[in-house]
Every structure is written in C-alpha cells, then in structure tokens.
Amino acid sequence: MKNFDRQYRLSAGKAGSTGFEIGGGKRPLHVSFSVEKADTNSQNTAKVTIWNLSDEHLAELSKNDCVVVLHAGYGDTRPLIFTGVVTFATTKADGADRATEIELVDNRIEVRDTYVSVSYAGAVNCKTLIQDTADQMGVTVSFSYNAEFKDIPNGYSYVGPARNVLTKACETSGLTWSINNGVLQVKKPGDTMSREVYELSAETGLLGLPERVQISNEDKGYSYGWDVEYLMNAAIGLDDYVYLNSKMVKGDFRVYSVRIEGDNMEGSWSCTARLLEVKQK
C-alpha cells in the first residue's frame, strides 16, 4: 500500500461562522497531529501543531469554543480524523518559523453545557429516552446493529446533565455509550457497531508484527487482543470489526482504542490500534 501523497484538510471556526481551511494547494502548511480515541465514555483528545499560520487564522483559533475538523489520508481519500473544540492554544518561535500548538477535546461543548429535561408519564423505552436526549444535546445518535432496549416502567422524569440520562438508559438496557467525532454511539459492551469487516494485512497496510496484550476490565476480568500498527487509515474507527491477517495471528477483533499520528512533511503517517476479542453473546 502506498505511503506517499499525504494529504490533509483542517478547518477551524466557531459553529455557524465562516472560519478558515488549510491543507489544499501545491504548498500546504506544515502540520503534525496526534489523536487518541478509546471505547469509553470519557472524551477523546487530540494535539495539533501548525506552522506559520496567518494572524487572521490565529485570531480565529483564539475565539471561545472554536471547533477544529481534521481530515487526513492519501490523495483524494481523506477520512475524518477528529472533530473537537480548542481547549488550549499557544504560538512560539521555531527557528525562523512560528509553531502553533493546539489541544482539542471531542464534543466538549455538548458534554459540558447540555442540561436536558425529560418527562414521561407511563412506561418509556430506553431507545426513546436516548434519542430524545441526543436531540436536546444536538448530536446525531447511532445504535449498533444488535442493540436491544428495555422499558423503564412507571414513568421517568429528570432535569440535569445529559450524560446522567444516557448512563441510566444504557445501564438499564445493558448497553454502553460514547461520543466520537460528534456522533453518540450506543452498543453492547465489548461488541462492535456494525457487521462490516476491515481486513488488516501486509497488503492493506499492516506494519511490523502484532503484539499480544491483556488488559484488566475492573470487575469484569481480563480482555485479550493485539496491538497493531498500520498505514494511515482513519476509515477504521472505534468499535469496528477488523479481520487481522498476519503470520502470527488470524481472526476477527474489534477496535478498542486507536492512536493516529501524522506529519505531512516527514515522520509518521500511521495508526496504532488495540484490537480485542469480540465477546460472543
């Protein structure tokens, strides 16, 4: 698989404003980034460094709740890498250039600011509760292909942080929730979002040898899997099915966490993922 023609597009601005976009043209600005995502309900994070931004671009980044959207890949194929809000930005000299370092958090506004009000007189299905909460949060909701939802009997009323409603509805139905790139994902614990399978092999970008891992799940015992590195492919997301096809191991796994690192001028342009065994239901 090729590892040339590295391409990115980065846009930034307050929601609803024009903002700016960089990355196109024959001489795109130098950008490096590191993104961390995991299958938990904690927020995902990213760090981005951009060299030689204009004063106008720097002013845009300094606005409250500035949203940054990053796509990256090869040629015209540039999947979404990260969407998040600027929580910290600083600019300093780097030789004859100036480098702006940005820290981002996935959906900080929705999780931080959204209070919801829900009230149901009779029994309410947890899927309805989750959908109504997502609507008030202003986020799209995606349910896994095999998610099942229970009813809460005798009515339900709540006013407060949206995350508490989501946790209540998911725990009642034996599900988990997380927010990834602006999408609220609801699924069974230890399972995948869809049945689509991505193959990771030397032919599709797998680098080096997979490393065996064992992680503790608090009161749920241990999970087993593999850490793998592969050429930049952000189309493979959290909780996706992956068929790992290497000399050491062949089998189906789910993406538990992923770190995406890139530099359009030099160095890394790859993903490192932790693949865990898919729990059979």
Pin down the residues of each PLM region.
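Assembly/oligomerization scaffold segments
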Residues: 1-103, 225, 266-268, 281
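Sec-dependent N-terminal signal peptides of Gram-negative outer-membrane/periplasmic proteins
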Residues: 55-57, 73-74, 95, 112, ...
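Extended Gly/Ser/Thr-rich low-complexity repeat segments
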Residues: 58-68, 112-120, 239-245
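Short beta-strand-centered interaction patches in the first periplasmic/extracellular domains
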Residues: 97-109, 140-217
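Polar, S/T/G-rich
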Residues: 123-131, 135-136, 158-172, 236-237
